Every structure is written in structure tokens, then in C-alpha cells.
Swiss-Prot record:
Start-end of Basic and acidic residues biased regions: 494-505, 1044-1078
Gene from which the chain derives: Nrk
Chain intervals for the UniProt region annotation (Disordered): 385-404, 471-568, 760-854, 1029-1080
Positions annotated as active site in the UniProt record: 177 (proton acceptor)
Phylogenetic lineage: Eukaryota, Metazoa, Chordata, Craniata, Vertebrata
Assigned protein family: Belongs to the protein kinase superfamily. STE Ser/Thr protein kinase family. STE20 subfamily.
Protein name (Swiss-Prot/TrEMBL): Nik-related protein kinase
Coiled coil: 716-750
GO biological process, one term: negative regulation of cell population proliferation
Length: 1455
């Protein structure tokens, strides 16, 4: 089954447009009952295969709703319709299944159909899915004796559930309803997650439905808490809690608290301790697993990826037997069901009613507290939080349910806002406040969305401080502009009754054109001044005005009707996205995304002598400094600990803040003292998590590798490039601004975007103008003040100093808010300027130096700047976005790879490669947009045709390949980038820096930790049933900014195959086989279809492919010339072996393969036909020695060392000739066909070395190594010339090599390490390696580390040095490592193959597939390597990988 990127990304917006199932599927019998319909057994008409068909009643056309405008595509709007809530849930579930069902733990989705019935009968929606014959986990538990599953079964099922959740979480989907009923099992014990009706809410733009969702007994406490406190939020870890409850359900037959009523259970879950299993007979690992899953504070709860590393699910002993026993149990259940006539996939009526009731929690009948504010912007897709143009994936009716809910709440006068006093009464201003025009203009420069807030008297006093002041440059004044007077929610309520309703899904301007620079005084000056001088009407704007300015009902406080009639409220017009988050959450100060580019309320010093407002020329720098003064004061007031000490008296701003907090302007259910204690505990917890010592053991810095001068140069270059980009694309950005009406988004998206928490130390602000002095001062190495932040209006825009005494302009560069390691105080002085020179806030989302609890969402942290005269003590990522990463073994790629994507514009820009930063890097998180996985093509220097986002971001932010920080290891939780914290940027070490490459990654390959390499993250998975994809960079392309590897065929960005569907490849890493069997007719790849079929209309996409994948005879049309000659190629042979392939060896051009029961010959010269040579004998290891006309094997049940004559095998192949049959019989009689050597039994491994016409064979037996020497008429081939005892060590693998002194050396590995024996002196020595590593030597079965050395390159010192290099590269020994003639290192572990340059250890290519249980190295010759993969159903397939570039091989090796 193909991965995402083709039909999966096309949203179903109209059910009536779905095809009719007639002639494709037919229904047989009802096998179950679902929430919205019945489940039938379906039959595919052509093939007769069985499927599950979910049949639901639906309307062809939705219900009309006059005046509702909906999105039908991303360019236009029209009067539209809406479906019912049930149909809407079905449609969004359908779309989710289309996108994400390619994972092996997600139920396979075959398609949706709309069945038209005759009049009088309702039409039907058919959702065709994989048939899970065993039913749900709940059904299996109920039909199991004692209603309890075995612990091993629970571990296996929990692991599969976590893998599926990790896949969903990587695509920003929270399932929210994980329970036994929603986890199905197939007949062969495959685990499938179903029911995405609730999880579809996470991909919507409205936040109101993201709060209280799920089934009560499985619901996480933080989800329940959102009902009581809408300011609380939760993230993907709520699913982990549900996994823990499901584990208890499997262990005890029912979830905890199941005897209580649902609402009672909610209260108990929220207030009581986490549940535990009642019986004490479960293992400690299981109990600890459940404890970790059900940590009540979700900030400390591991993610699904972390839980996969838990020993309970990670170290399942005898997994094959566990699966076999579970399969046998499920088979018995299926048979029992068939006898009793119980439905196959039954979902009980109680469960259906329960889900129906639970879904009602989301309806309009829920309390207003549930709907008044979105619980968390983290529960919405990342693309809508940033500057991405509208997406066609948004359903046309998504805004309608929330509009309906709002209207009902408004009619009931029950709209609550975070901005109200604790007694829920609104205090009004006695008179109208005059607001300076530049105050309103500042708020309108970039953000037209304003909130008109009726404020208490304390705010009225504060508003006087915000009145007009003269600018410091003494600009000419303009006529006074009165502040708009509005009645807030009441006025908008009237507008709703009298006017056509506005679309609540309007996307604000800054979300469309976020990539543009803030308005410059010379760009659009006339239009901006016109906005300033035009007073805002008291009533909401007319229809011809921008809808963003009209729809502010979510951000206004509706006072009681009587007070509205009595007096007219006084309004302070503020920026919605800043002030509301600041004032609504008094426990945290939240700075929204892109704050440094949103000009808000300029606050100047109060001047009583200037009664009138001064004209403001929209200079960004002046607005920012004053706004950040307000934010600084708010932050200091709100985050100040109870014992905080302020050395200077409070100024007007501080008094303003004190009044705000003491007047109860913020909603806070707890007393003030309790609030402060919570703040103190919060700060203490964050400080504890950010302690440097927590990272010391995981991230060891090599600061000597940092080249700060290069970073400074790149920063300046990036600054210049940004100016050019913005100037050249001014017209395009203006068009985006004019098209704002074509975009839609909730207004709550405006001010509840992903936010970063800033903790600011209480201190007095420095006078304006001290910015330069502050920046030049060295930063103290103090963990309480490890950050300096700088606010600036734009990226790369020069901001004049706020003090006239300093006329020169101080260039401000964004500084990442990520924590820094204080390893060397002198380094900070050297970094005084460069330490704040991080990338643009558009793309620099990910924090490498994340605390140990960092999550996928941490990349959404913003880059902000410190205003003049302000210090920021400690800045941390939002604590609710944090999550523990367990060492560098964390499955980071699951959460990082697919989250940072550049949004593809309408056409590839012709600007510099850094133009990618204009388009939000996080916008394509779901992979729905037509996006290239590579950066945009740079026609001038061709520097960014990369297949990896890391270099896209590096280029967009001016990073040089040689100026990157040394990334020492794959520590996810560590602190990795003092001044170079890139999003997933994993920069190579010094050796790589010298080569000018920026694609190395030193990390844990064995744990799949992938960070910033430019190859591996591109493709870690396989498409469809048997594909495999590699990431590669091809040729090294140099450019003016430093050498970077680029994809060989990445130049053709205009090609639809290369440009439009590139985003599908990173998601292959989560793709696995959808069925248990991989057959040749089920292979479908984005590159080449393996079964000879066409690609079903999908374009051939190879831009990011380093290893193009094809059949054994790839078609030339599928591969460009660059790929064919410059990129390693992987061939997958279509033959599917029913048993595991253990070994292989090349015989001429053909390949001999040994399996558990047979010896095969694969004819590679023709059509890859398979010939069975020897039957009913297992082969553990084989090697062809053509000089001796022998095939040496370890075979048989007793693992004997046997030799077969190649001539005899050749005669078996040519057995059609009668003469050959006679020769075979004669050879059998003379024992020339096959004979055992020295009667050895229990052989583990052997190695063959040919040296000076002598063939040496070393055989590892139980406690010794036998050395044979075969030469023409010199030695007795049946007797070992030497036997080397290995003391108490059991040899696992053995290898032979000739040392530097032409002495024969035997290398072998054991469970205790790596050992060397001198064949002449018989002295055994050990090679120093980590104690926990088992080293496997060359030409082994691929069970450990293998060294494949040429005869002339094997000396003890060289091997020791080699092993050290391997350890440096991988940080953990992979399954095997080989040096090939192409001067590359190829390492493979259980599920991945890596190819690195031998000289620089740069990762060049990688293969990774989740559907492969093992990757077993077979043999190699020249640039070709053969592997065997063990699939999920224990079948095997053979891969041929061509490593080298042909021109290099021809030149160097005459291949």
C-alpha cells in the first residue's frame, strides 16, 4: 500500500462525490455494530478477498444553512452547507484513515464509497477497511478464561499500540479514545488501532472541541481537568494514559472504576491517585510500565516513543513464541465465535451507547466553560499556527458547529472570557479613553485583529499610561484620533442578528503572509497612514471591511445586559494575540509565536504635557520597545516568586501591573497565596529540569570545534539575503495580504497559537539605550540566567536605538530561547554577539538543547528579542510541551522527522536557497500540502537541492557546513548547541567540518535516533508492502557558502515528480507492511512498482531518493541518469522465501542462498529464477571458494562443517541432461559431492582466507577454534593444522587476516568481547571495547558487529583503531560494519543500513524499514552488497545494494 502523498492527501469534502461501490464491493452479512452504523463482511468482487465494510446512513448533500460561507478550496469561498455532527465525524475519520492508515498498527483503509439508494431509503456511506477477524481487545479479553490475558500478550499488544500512537503523534494526531474496543486484532495477532472519529478533532482549526473528549474510564486527568479549568491543556501524552488503562483492562478484564457512573469516574480519576492492578501476581516491569503510563502530571509522563523503550515492551523474551501463542489463542476465539454465531467484529450495544453519550460531551449541551477557550493550541495542526496559505484539507463545515455553539452561548449571555474579575462582573470605564493613533496603528501594522475589551477601572487607570506620547525623534504630529468605542460582545451579538454572519475561520493576515517582513515605512505607507487616520467605527465593520476586524466575539467580554444599557463601556483596543494570553493566564506569561514580528502597543514614557496623540510613522522599532516594556512588567509581576526582591521602586508600569493583579482582573480559582506557591513550584520544577548537570552525562560538548567567526559571517550574509528576499517579493506578499478573505481560521487561533513560556527574573529595567552595552557584556554562567532575549520587529531588519544619544543603528539578530549550556564562561564573552544570532523565528522551532522532557512540539518555540534595558533571566520551553527523553536511544525520528517541512509556494521561488524560510517550516506537519521534501532550488549556486530539512533550515538561516557546532552523539535530551541550536540540526564533528559537509550525524544508529543528518531522515521506511527507501546526497556540490552534499537529481525542481510529492518520503519511516505476507503482487513504491504494474497514477518521485528502489532489472525510464550513475541503487528481488534466509554467497554472477530447510540458487543473469539445489537441510553459513571448486557450509541439524563440490551442484542445475544425472550418481558413490570435514559438530561460524595459494579456514566451535589449511597436495584437508582453545569463552564469530608482519591472525568474538589470536605464537589478546557490547566479526550472520577487512589491511593496531572509529561514528555498535572497495563503511543493524564515507565518516545513505524484523548481511563483491530481510511474517526477501558511483569504480578499481 502506498504511503501518503497521492490520493491520501486529498480531503473528502463532499460525501456525494465518492464513487459508488456497485461492482467493486458487495456486502455479505452483518458482523458487528458500530457507533454510527453496522459493520458488514464485504467481498471484493474481482479477487474475492474479505474486508470489513462500515455502513452508515448519510446524506448526499448536506443540510442547507443560508449565509454560511465555507471553504471549498484554498482560493475561493461560496455559500455552502453543513453536515450533521455524526456525518462530520465520519467524514473527518475517513480523511484521517486515508492519510495515516499506511502504518502496520493502524487499520488499513481501502476506500470510501457512497451508495445511492432509491427514493424512500437513506443513502449509505461505505467505509471499507481491513478485516480484523479476532475482534477488539475487549472482546478477546471477555472470551478468555478468567478474563485476563497473559503478561507477555499484554506486553506485545501494548507495544503495538504504542507504535501506532507514535505514528499518529508524529503526524500531530491525538487519538483521544484509546481503549480496548478501539484496538482490534487480526487472525495472525496483528494489532490495529481504529475509530478516529474523535481524533479527527485534533486536525481542525476550532479549539472548542479539543477539550473534553474521550471515553470517561480511559480519559486522562489532564483532559478531565480541561472541563473545570479551560486554561489547562494537554498534549499527545493523554493517549499514553489511555494505554495504561487499556493494559489494566487486559489484565483484569475491565478498566478501573468501571462500576462507577461515568461522571463519578471522572471525578475519581481527577482527584484520586493513578489506578493500579489489584493482583500482586504481575511482574515488577509490568507494574512499572503502568506507573509510567499513568503519571498524573502529564508534564512528567513519557511519550509513546519513550514508552517504547520501556523494558516491559522493549525486551519481550521469545517474541516469536509470544506471537504464536497469541495467534493460536485468537484462532480458538474465532472458531468459538463461528460455532456460537457470535459476530466476528462485535462492538456491544453498551459500548455504542457509551460512545454516543461520550460524544455528546462535545455538543452544545456542554457547559460554557468547555467552549469558551481552546484548551491548547498544541491540539491543533501546526500548519494553521504559522504562515501557511489556506489548505484544501480544511473541511467546508468545520466552522459551522462552533458558530452554532457560540450563537447559543451568546443568546444565553453566557460567553465567558479569561479576562474578567473573579466575581464575574464587568466594571466599566466612566468615560471614553483616548488612544493615540500610533497605538492603534501599531496594533494594525501586521495584526489587523484587535480585541475590544471592556476593562475594570484599574485598567482604565492603566490606559492613561498608554496614551499618546511624542516619539523620540520628534516626528510631526497628526490630527488626534479618537479611540474606537465598542460595546464588545453585545455589539457583535447585535451584528450577528442583523447582518450576515461572518466566517469564523478567517485566517488572519499574519498567518497568510507571515513570511513577509513587517511593514516598512516606505512600503505601503499611504495605505497604512490611511488606516491610522480613519477612526474605527463604534459598531463592527461592514461586510466590505476585513472580516478579521469584525469577528472578535471570542475575545470580548459580554457584560450583563443591564449594565450595557445603563452605561457605555470604555474600551481599550489592544492586540489580541498578545494581551489576552498575557492577561488570561496569570500563572504563566505566554509570548505567542512570531511575537518579535508583531507590532503591538507602543508604550512610551508618560508625558502629562502632551494631551494629544502624536503621529506615528509606523516605525517597528519604536513600537516593539514599548510593547516589550509592558510584557516585561507583566512577566515580572506574574512570575515573581513570593520572596522575590525588587531593588528599585515601582514605576508607573509596575503600578499598573500591580493594580491589574490585585484587582482580580485575571480569572483565578485559587487564592492568591496558593497561586504564588504554584508559580514558585513551577519555577522550581523548570529550574530543576534545566540544570546543566542533567545534560552533562548525555551531551559532551566540544567547544573547540565551534567557529564563531564563521557563524558571524553567515549571520551577516543571512541578514543581507533576507533583505533581498523581502524586497524582491514585496509584490507577492501584497497579493497574499489582499487575498486574506480567501483564508479562514478561528479567531481563537489568533491569540491562542503555540506559545512559549518566558520566565523573567524580577529586576528593574535598564534605561533605554543600554542595549549595546548589555549585548556586549559577557553572560554570566548561571543556570538561573542562561538566556538573553532580544525583541525585534523583523528578521534581518536593522532597528535604530531607542535613545537619541546613539544615532547609529544596532543590528538585532534573533536569539533562540532554548537553554544554553554554561560550560565555559569565556565562550559566552566570545559569543556576545553571535550567541544571539539564531535563525529566523519562522523556521527555528526545534530546540536541540531541550530539557529531558522535551517533546515534538518544542520546535514550535519562538525566537524573541530583548527590548532595550531589559534582562531576561531564564527562558524555558513551555512546560506543558515538555516530555522526558530517555537518553540518546529515544525514538526521536518518530517525532521529529515529519514535523519540520517547508511549505511549497505556488511555484519554486527564484531567490536564494534561504527563501525557504519565507514559508513556514512547520506548516506541512501533516504532509497534506503539495510540498517538496527538499529545499527550493537555487539556480545560481544549486546549494539547496537537499532531501533533508536540516540543510534546508541551515541554508535558510545561513549556516555554513564548516561553521556548524560539533554534535557529539545522538543525545536527544542533552544540551547540544550553545550558540547553534538548530531545529534537529545535528552538525558533524571536526573531521567532517574539514570536508565542508553538513550532513554527518554522530548518533545512536542502533536506537534509530535521527537528528540532523541530511540523508537518513529522508527515508527510513518502505513504501507499501515490500519497498525500501534510502536517503542520499549523491555528489558533493560546492557553492559560495560552503560545500554541502546535495541530491544528484535534485535540480529538477520543476518536475512534478520531483517537486510535488517529495514530502511523502519522510513518512515512510513509519510505514510498515500492511499485511502479514509480502508478495510480489502487493509491492507498491513511489519510485518503481515491484510487481510490474504502473504506479496507479502516482508520479514517480525521486528527488530525495538516494537509493532508488526498483526491481532486479530496473526500467530506465524510472531512474534519471544522475541516479543511475551517481547514486547507490537498491534492488529488491521479487522472490518471497517462505522461510528465513540465513546466509548467501556469490557463485559467479549467481547467488546461493541458504535457508532453514533448503539451499537455493538465484539466477541473477536472467529473470532471477530460483533453483532448489538441496532439500531438507538447514544452512547456517555458506561460502563459495571457486579456486577449490568447493562450497563450504555449516549445515544440518548438528551444524556440521560440510563441503559441496561446485561441479556437482552445477550438474544438479543441468539435470535435464541424462549425462549429468549419471555423473551425479557417480559422484555420490565416491563421496565427491558432499562430505563432512573433521567430523566437527556444533560449528558456530567459519571464515575463509586465501593467501599465497593457500586457503585457510578458521572454524569456531563450542570452546575452541580449528584452523585448516588447504593447498594443492600440501595439507590434509580433513585434519586441522591447529586447534586454539578459547578458555572459557564461547566463540560466536571468527575471522582471519594477515597482519602487518605477514603473520596470520585469528579474530573472534564472544559474549565477553573481542579477541585476537596470533596463529604462530598462539597468544590470545583482547581488544578494548565497552563491556556491554558483543562484537561479531566479518562475514558473519549479521548478529553483532562485523568487520570485513581486506587481507592486506588486518593488523591488531589497525583493527583496534577501526573499532574506535566505528564507536565514534555510531555511538553504539550496529549489527555489522563492513569496509568496501568503494572506501565506504556500511553498517547494518536489525532494521537499517547505513553507508558512510570511510575518510570522513559522513553518512551518505541509509535504508530503513519498519516491516523488516532483521537485516542480515549475506555477501559482498566490489560495490555490490546482498542482504536478506526477515519480514513480519517470518518470510524473507533478498536485497541487492550497489554502493559505488560507477565512474569512480571504473576509474579506481576497473570494475
Amino acid at each position: 500500500m502506498a504511503g501518503p502523498g497521492s490520493w491520501r492527501d486529498k480531503e473528502v469534502t463532499d460525501l456525494g462525490q465518492l464513487p459508488d461501490p456497485t461492482g467493486i464491493f458487495s456486502l455479505d452479512k452483518a458482523i458487528g455494530l458500530g457507533t454510527y452504523g453496522r459493520i458488514f463482511l464485504g467481498i471484493h468482487e474481482k479477487t474475492g478477498s474479505l474486508v470489513a465494510v462500515k455502513v452508515m446512513s448519510a446524506r448526499k448533500t448536506p443540510l442547507p444553512e443560508i449565509g454560511r460561507r465555507v471553504r471549498v478550496n484554498k482560493y475561493q469561498k461560496s455559500v455552502g452547507w453543513r453536515y450533521s455532527d455524526e456525518e462530520e465525524d465520519l467524514r473527518t475519520e475517513l480523511n484521517l484513515l486515508r492519510k495515516y492508515s499506511f502504518h502496520k498498527n493502524i487499520v488499513t483503509f481501502y476506500g470510501a464509497f457512497f451508495k445511492l439508494n432509491p427514493p424512500g431509503h437513506q443513502h449509505q456511506l461505505w467505509m471499507v477497511m481491513e478485516l480484523c477477524a479476532a475482534g477488539s481487545v475487549t472482546d478477546v479479553v471477555r472470551m478468555t478464561r478468567n478474563q485476563s490475558l497473559k503478561e507477555d500478550w499484554i506486553a506485545y499488544i501494548c507495544r503495538e499500540i504504542l507504535q501506532g500512537l507514535a505514528h499518529l503523534h508524529a503526524h500531530q494526531v491525538i487519538h483521544r479514545d484509546i481503549k480496548g474496543q478501539n484496538v482490534l486484532l487480526t487472525h495472525d495477532a496483528e494489532v490495529k488501532i481504529v475509530d478516529f472519529g474523535v481524533s479527527a478533532q485534533v486536525s481542525r482549526t476550532n479549539g472548542r472541541r479539543n477539550s473534553f473528549i474521550g471515553t470517561p474510564y480511559w480519559m486522562a486527568p489532564e483532559v478531565i481537568h480541561c472541563d473545570e479549568d479551560p486554561r489547562c491543556s494537554y498534549d499527545y501524552r493523554s493517549d499514553v494514559w489511555s494505554v495504561g488503562i487499556t493494559a489494566i483492562e487486559m489484565a483484569e478484564g475491565a478498566p478501573p472504576l468501571c462500576k462507577l457512573q461515568p461522571l463519578e469516574a471522572l471525578c475519581v480519576i481527577l482527584r484520586e491517585a493513578a489506578p493500579k492492578v489489584k493482583s500482586s501476581g504481575w511482574s515488577r516491569k509490568f507494574q512499572n510500565f503502568m506507573e509510567n503510563c499513568m503519571i498524573k502530571n502529564f508534564l512528567f509522563r513519557p511519550t509513546s516513543g519513550n514508552m517504547l523503550l520501556h523494558p516491559f515492551v522493549h525486551d519481550i523474551k521469545n517474541e516469536r513464541r509470544v506471537v504464536e501463542s497469541l495467534t493460536k489463542h485468537l484462532t480458538g476465539i474465532i472458531q468459538k465465535r463461528e460455532k456460537k454465531g457470535i459476530p466476528v467484529a462485535f462492538e456491544g450495544e453498551e459500548a455504542a451507547k457509551e460512545q454516543y453519550i461520550t460524544r455528546r460531551f462535545r455538543g452544545p449541551s456542554c457547559t460554557p466553560e468547555l467552549l469558551r477557550v481552546p484548551t491548547s493550541s498544541r491540539c491543533r495542526p501546526l500548519r494553521v499556527l504559522h504562515g501557511e496559505p489556506p489548505q484544501p484539507r480544511w473541511l467546508p463545515d468545520q466552522e459551522d458547529p462552533q458558530d452554532q455553539e457560540l450563537q447559543q452561548l451568546q443568546k444565553a449571555a453566557g460567553v465567558f472570557m479569561p479576562l474578567h474579575s473573579q466575581d464575574n462582573t464587568s466594571k466599566l470605564f466612566p468615560k471614553q479613553v483616548e488612544v493615540a493613533p500610533y497605538l492603534r496603528g501599531a496594533a494594525q501594522v501586521v495584526m489587523p485583529v484587535l480585541v475590544q475589551v471592556e476593562a475594570p477601572p484599574q485598567v482604565s487607570k492603566a490606559a492613561q499610561m498608554l496614551k499618546s506620547l511624542p516619539t523620540q525623534d520628534n516626528k510631526a504630529t497628526s490630527p488626534e484620533v479618537q479611540a474606537p468605542v465598542a460595546e464588545g460582545q453585545q455589539a457583535q451579538h447585535e451584528a450577528l442578528e442583523t447582518e450576515q454572519p461572518k466566517d469564523l475561520d478567517q485566517v488572519p493576515e499574519e498567518f497568510q503572509g507571515q513570511d513577509r517582513a513587517p511593514e516598512q515605512p516606505r512600503q505601503g505607507q499611504a495605505a497604512e497612514q490611511q488606516q491610522i487616520h480613519n477612526p474605527v467605527p463604534e459598531q463592527p465593520p461592514e461586510e466590505d471591511r476585513e472580516p478579521e476586524q469584525a469577528e472578535v466575539q471570542e475575545e470580548a467580554v459580554e457584560p450583563p445586559q443591564a449594565e450595557i444599557e445603563d452605561k457605555e463601556p470604555e474600551v481599550v483596543q489592544v492586540h489580541a494575540q498578545v494581551l489576552l494570553p498575557l492577561l488570561s493566564q496569570n500563572r504563566h506569561v505566554l509570548l505567542p509565536l512570531h511575537l518579535d514580528r508583531q507590532l503591538l502597543i507602543p508604550v512610551g514614557e508618560q508625558n502629562e504635557e502632551v494631551p494629544r496623540a502624536q503621529a506615528w510613522d509606523l516605525e517597528a522599532s519604536r513600537a516593539v520597545g514599548a510593547v516589550q516594556a509592558l510584557i516585561e512588567g507583566l512577566s515580572r509581576d506574574l512570575l515573581r516568586a513570593p520572596n522575590a526582591f525588587v531593588t528599585k521602586p515601582l514605576g508607573p508600569l509596575q503600578i499598573f501591573l500591580e493594580n491589574l493583579s490585585t484587582d482580580g482582573f485575571y480569572t483565578e480559582p485559587e487564592p492568591t497565596q496558593k497561586k504564588k506557591s504554584k508559580v514558585a513550584s513551577l519555577r522550581k520544577a523548570i529550574a530543576k529540569r534545566l540544570r546543566p548537570k542533567r545534560f552533562r552525562a548525555k551531551a559532551l560538548w566540544r567547544l573547540e570545534d565551534f567557529e564563531f567567526s564563521d557563524v558571524e559571517t553567515s549571520r551577516r550574509r543571512r541578514h543581507r539575503r533576507w533583505e533581498d528576499i523581502f524586497n524582491q517579493h514585496e509584490e507577492q506578499l501584497r497579493r497574499v495580504e489582499n487575498d486574506r478573505e480567501d483564508d479562514s481560521s478561528d479567531n481563537d487561533e489568533v491569540f491562542h497559537s503555540i506559545q512559549a513560556e518566558v520566565q523573567i527574573e524580577p529586576h528593574a529595567a535598564n534605561p533605554a539605550g543600554n542595549e549595546v552595552h548589555e549585548r556586549s557584556a559577557p553572560m554570566p554562567c548561571n543556570r538561573n540566567r542562561t538566556h538573553r532575549v532580544k525583541f525585534s520587529p523583523s528578521v534581518g531588519e536593522e532597528e535604530p536605538s531607542l535613545e537619541e544619544a546613539q544615532p547609529q543603528q544596532q543590528q538585532q539578530q534573533p536569539m533562540n530561547i532554548r537553554p544554553r549550556n554554561c560550560l565555559n564562561p569565556q565562550n559566552f564573552q566570545a559569543q556576545s554577539d553571535s550567541s544571539s544570532e539564531e535563525d529566523s523565528p519562522v523556521t527555528r522551532r526545534k530546540s536541540q538543547s531541550s530539557p529531558p522532557y522535551s517533546t515534538i512540539d518544542q520546535k514550535l518555540l519562538i525566537d524573541i528579542h530583548v527590548p532595550d534595558g531589559f534582562k531576561v533571566g531564564k527562558i524555558s520551553p513551555p512546560v506543558y510541551l515538555t516530555n522526558e527523553w530517555v537518553g540518546y536511544n529515544a525514538l526521536s525520528e518518530i517525532f521529529w522527522d515529519d514535523w519540520i517541512m517547508p511549505t511549497r509556494p505556488a511555484r519554486p521561488p527564484e531567490e536564494d536557497g534561504d527563501y525557504v524560510e519565507l514559508y513556514d517550516a512547520d506548516a506541512n506537519a501533516n504532509g497534506d500540502e503539495e510540498v517538496a521534501n527538499g529545499a527550493y532550488e537555487d539556480p545560481r549556486d544549486g546549494a539547496n537541492g537537499h532531501d533533508d530539512m536540516n540543510n534546508q533550515l541551515d541554508q535558510a538561516n545561513g549556516y555554513e557546513g564548516h561553521g556548524a557546532a560539533g554534535y557529539n552523539g545522538g543525545d536527544v535530551g542533552g544540551n547540544h548547541g550553545a550558540a547553534f541550536n538548530g531545529p534537529r540540526a545535528n552538525y558533524p564533528r571536526a573531521g567532517i567540518l574539514k570536508n565542508g559537509h553538513n550532513d554527518g550525524r554522530a548518533l545512536n544508529r542502533g536506537a534509530f535516533g535521527v537528528f540532523g543528518d541530511n540523508a537518513a531522515r529522508a527515508f527510513h521506511g518502505a513504501a507499501g508492502e515490500a519497498g525500501a527507501a534510502f536517503g542520499n546526497h549523491g555528489a558533493n556540490r560546492g557553492n559560495g557558502r560552503g560545500n554541502r552534499n546535495r541530491e544528484a537529481n535534485g535540480r529538477n525542481e520543476e518536475n512534478g515528480a520531483f517537486g510535488r510529492d517529495q514530502h511523502v518520503f519522510p513518512e515512510f519511516e513509519h510505514e510498515e507492511s500492511d499485511r502479514g505476507t509480502e508478495t510480489s503482487d502487493s509491492i507498491a513504491l513511489e519510485i518503481t512498482s515491484f510487481d510490474g504494474e504502473q504506479n496507479s497514477g502516482r508520479p514517480v518521485s525521486s528527488t530525495t531518493m538516494g537509493f532508488p528502489i526498483g526491481r532486479s532489472s530496473p526500467r530506465g525510464s524510472d531512474f534519471g541518469s544522475d541516479i543511475s550513475y551517481n547514486s547507490p541503487i537498491l534492488h529488491v528481488y521479487e522472490k518471497d522465501f517462505s522461510s528465513e534466509v540465513y546466509c548467501g554467497s556469490l557463485w559467479g554472477v549467481n547467488l546461493l542462498l541458504g535457508t532453514q530447510s533448503h539451499l537455493y540458487l538465484m539466477d541473477r543473469s536472467g529473470k532471477a529464477e530460483i533453483v532448489k539445489l538441496i532439500k531438507r537441510r538447514p544452512f547456517r553459513q555458506i561460502q563459495v571458494v571457486e579456486q577449490l571448486n568447493l562450497l563450504i557450509t555449516i549445515s544440518g541439524k548438528k551444524n556440521r562443517l560440510r563441503v559441496y563440490h561446485l561441479s556437482w551442484l552445477r550438474n544438479k542445475i543441468l539435470n535435464n541432461d541424462p549425462k549429468s544425472k549419471k555423473r551425479q550418481k557417480a559422484m555420490r558413490k565416491k563421496e565427491e559431492a558432499c562430505k563432512a570435514i573433521d567430523k566437527l559438530i556444533g560449528c558456530e561460524h567459519f571464515s575463509v582466507l586465501q593467501h599465497e595459494e593457500t586457503t585457510y579456514i578458521a572454524v569456531a566451535v563450542k570452546s575452541s577454534i580449528h584452523l585448516f589449511a588447504w593447498a594443492p597436495k600440501s595439507f590434509d584437508e580433513n585434519t586441522a593444522i591447529k586447534v586454539f582453545p578459547t578458555r572459557d569463552l564461547k566463540p560466536l564469530t571468527v575471522d582471519l587476516a594477515v597482519g602487518s608482519e605477514k603473520t596470520l591472525k585469528i579474530f573472534f568474538s564472544s559474549a565477553n568481547g573481542y579477541h585476537i589470536i596470533d596463529a604462530e605464537s598462539e597468544v590470545m589478546s583482547e581488544v578494548t571495547l565497552p563491556n556491554n557490547n558483543v562484537v561479531i566479526l566479518p562475514d558473519c550472520l549479521g548478529l553483532g558487529v562485523m568487520l570485513s577487512l581486506n587481507a592486506e589491511a588486518a593488523s591488531e593496531e589497525a583493527n583496534e583503531q577501526l573499532l574506535k572509529k566505528i564507536l565514534d561514528v555510531w555511538k553504539d555498535i550496529p549489527s555489522s560494519v563492513a569496509f568496501e572497495c568503494t572506501k565506504r563503511i556500511t553498517g547494518w543493524d536489525q532494521k537499517a543500513i547505513e553507508v558512510r564515507s570511510l575518510q570522513s565518516t559522513i553518512l551518505e545513505n541509509e535504508l530503513k524499514r519498519r516491516s523488516i524484523k532483521k537485516l542480515r548481511f549475506l555477501c559482498a563483491r566490489g560495490d555490490k552488497m546482498f542482504f536478506a530481510s526477515t519480514l513480519s511474517n517470518d518470510h524473507s526477501r533478498v536485497y541487492l545494494m550497489s554502493l559505488g558511483k560507477l565512474e569512480e569504480l571504473h576509474r579506481s578499481y576497473a570494475v
